[in-house]
């Protein structure tokens, strides 16, 4: 059993070796074919170039002498032969180099296979790590070879064109920011100046108002002029209004409050309005009664009902009969006259009513009717 197993293992190893050798041979054959194809292409390209060169020389040498053209053709042929020989030698050298490289690759592959067979008994982790490192190293070496094989191509446009000069112009964004900062600074300065001017004007107005309130507005204005301060028309107007307020306060005893504009309010009219307000809203005293109020209260129409209605309409309070007895002789005479007048008015009203409603007159004409009214 042990011998059979050993023989089977050896047979498998020989089969794997044969397969790998066959693969290696096929790869070498492909590489050779590829290199031969490249060589043929290069030969064709060189031959095409030579044919073109010959055609150009034939065209250029038509008008020249035959002796010169023959000597040149001989020289050209000798040169072309030398070039072909040198190219063939370089191709042979390249082929020999490629063969040596292929041999080295085959040797390295066989060595790798032997190493893999030996390291199968070791741990899987080590085996994986080594295989990864080998694959990475192979890929890196291939990349290096490709880089070496590729010639460096320098772009003529980049080499010929000079580098652009550095920017020496103005930056518009920075200029705009600087201009904005300058404008803001100017606006701040102007605002500060205006605030200072307003404060100075207010101080001058306060000084003028205080001077006018003391009573000598003209003298104070003269003092301001003497001191050297500029007296504006506003200050002069404020001084005049302060003088008027002081005069109204001395006459009426009513001062204009500070929340009113002194230039827009007349102090005399304001004092009159305040007096009227006090008269309206103050409480009435019991003893104070005017003559007209007494006359309307004592008015008598000759009929008690009419007297009561009239007093209710006028808002007069009813008085006692005892108070009515104590009346002066003059007032009694006036009351009698009022009663007679009201009686005559009632009679005339009734006569006019009878004429208008019944359309009948007293007598034949207008005079008789008027006499009848008089007799009544």
UniProtKB/Swiss-Prot annotation:
Coiled-coil boundaries: 171-214
Region (Disordered): 1-171
Disulfide bridges in this chain: none
Record-listed cross-link Glycyl lysine isopeptide (Lys-Gly) (interchain with G-Cter in SUMO2), residues: 317
Keywords of the record: Coiled coil, Isopeptide bond, Phosphoprotein, Ubl conjugation
Cross-linked sites for Glycyl lysine isopeptide (Lys-Gly) (interchain with G-Cter in SUMO1): 317
Protein name, UniProt field: Arginine/serine-rich coiled-coil protein 2
Protein's organism: Mus musculus
